[in-house]
Amino acid sequence: MDRDFGIFSFLAVSVSAAGFFFGGFQYSFLILLSLMAIEFISTTLKETIIHKLSFKKVFARLVKKLVTLALISVCHFFDQLLNTQGSIRDLAIMFYILYESVQIVVTASSLGIPVPQMLVDLLETLKNKFKRKP
């Protein structure tokens, strides 16, 4: 009984902390987490296939994912401070969803997997919308 209480307490604290740091688990955030996992796994498997896998590369990629989540958290904090109702966080999440999607397509292409032109065009259009204007 005590063990179950400890597990549920840990889960409750974890979900509360995630809500504080990331503003909850809306679909856009869950999509981002899923794409980050897919990109991490697919790139790691690609490096395994081409015999270029190293602990240093995997660790660096993991650190980048954690820093991305930290940036999402910072955006959420700014939303709270500026009372923008999540628009800064949502924009950042959309940017990183696009980034992770492009990385997955690049990985698939480098493995020789055909990528539908419609998907390439869609990602290119979205990428152009997120580019900075001079």
Curated annotation (Swiss-Prot):
It holds the Pfam family Phage_holin_4_1. It comes from the Bacteria. Keywords: Cell membrane, Membrane, Transmembrane, Transmembrane helix. The chain crosses the membrane at residues 5-25, 30-50, 62-82. Belongs to the bacteriophage holin family. Cp-1 holin subfamily. NCBIfam families: holin_tox_secr (TIGR01593). This is Uncharacterized protein YtkC. The lineage of its organism: Bacteria, Bacillati, Bacillota, Bacilli, Bacillales.
